[in-house]
A protein has these predicted regions:
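Noncatalytic scaffold domains of N-terminal-nucleophile
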Residues: 1-181
Length: 181
């Protein structure tokens, strides 16, 4: 989600296939987000006259599933911690990396990103889209990933499962969830 944000990121979904060598079977993880709890037919009828919201608004979004997928992968098959797995991404988000042509082109061509001040701040620093090779930073994303690591570290004494769960729960039930809502 750092170097190729259009492919996958902390606010997105994931569909993952795993070969579980021990069980000798393919396992599928479907981390496609669910609709928010209050997104009911009645709510849309009352608030939007029964119309569906535009596809690029929060009203059409789902709860991001990717952090739960990371948790599931690490908890069931992993040996590393969130801290170990996320450290390279945190370093790139905060320190920057040379942006590739594909991501630079996607940013430049995106009208949706330009509609939201928070996206403009990240993707159009100085008011301009980055060019391929420019150093691109996303410190806000780095801070979000650090929060997952902090939550995990706070629960390390309770065991691996509880520590991983604490990171996931901070995203879905803690301050990160409240900031997104």
């Amino acid at each position: 989600g750092i170097v190729d944000a259009a492919s996958n990121g902390v606010g997105s979904d994931a569909v993952i296939l795993i070969w579980d060598a021990k069980a000798r079977q393919v396992v599928s993880i479907n981390a496609e987000g669910t609709a928010p709890k209050l997104a009911t037919i009645e709510w849309y009828q009352k608030n939007l006259d029964g119309k569906l919201p535009e596809s690029d608004t929060l009203l059409s979004g789902t709860v991001p599933g990717v952090v739960d997928a990371w948790y599931t992968l690490l908890d069931r098959w992993g040996t590393m911690t969130f801290a170990q797995v996320l450290q390279p991404a945190i370093e790139m988000a905060e320190g920057g990396f040379p942006i590739g042509e594909r991501m630079a082109g996607a940013i430049k061509g995106s009208r949706k990103l330009k509609k939201y001040p928070s996206s403009v701040k990240v993707y159009f620093p100085g008011g301009e889209a980055p060019k391929a090779g420019d150093i691109f930073k996303n410190p806000d994303l780095g801070r979000t990933l650090r929060k997952l690591v902090e939550a995990e570290k706070e629960q390390t004494g309770k065991g691996r499962h509880e520590a991983l769960k604490a990171a996931r729960d901070r995203f879905y039930k803690g301050d990160i969830a409240r900031e997104m809502a």
